Amino acid sequence: GPAAFGQSSELESEDSTATIENCLAEAEAGGRNRESCVGRMYDACPGNAGSTLEMVTCITNETAFWDARLNEVYRELIDIYRRRDSEFSDDYNMVARLRDTQRGWIEWRDLKCRFAYDEFRGGTLGRITGADCMMSMTAERVFELEDLKETAEM
């Protein structure tokens, strides 16, 4: 019931964040591939076997983790490109290109995930697939930007 739902969303805490953080640290150390870390917070979420609302909340909680990480990596990359753009006297404005690319990616993610939702004609399964799409695409974009950052720092 509602009480259980309230409890499960409160349990989205440092514990579940630590689950992904530890997984990513292992991945960085070469112990696993970082893609295997996606869904870790969801798996640890008490509501993941509950109602649609509880499941979507669990997915949304993890999406918030990836979204915060995405914003952080994006800002770091903008800073790197801003420095690099000022070092070179060419016409490559990588800050603007990254911004355009990110805007395009957001548009693509929203369209793709809306499709994942609409495919089930707005039913409960659509809410889950739509939310899962947002989570997995956001995590995937984090990895893409982390790779770009690694290259840009060379």
Regions found by a protein language model. Give the residues of each.
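N-terminal alpha-helical modules
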Residues: F5-M154
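Bacterial N-terminal signal peptides
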Residues: G1-P2
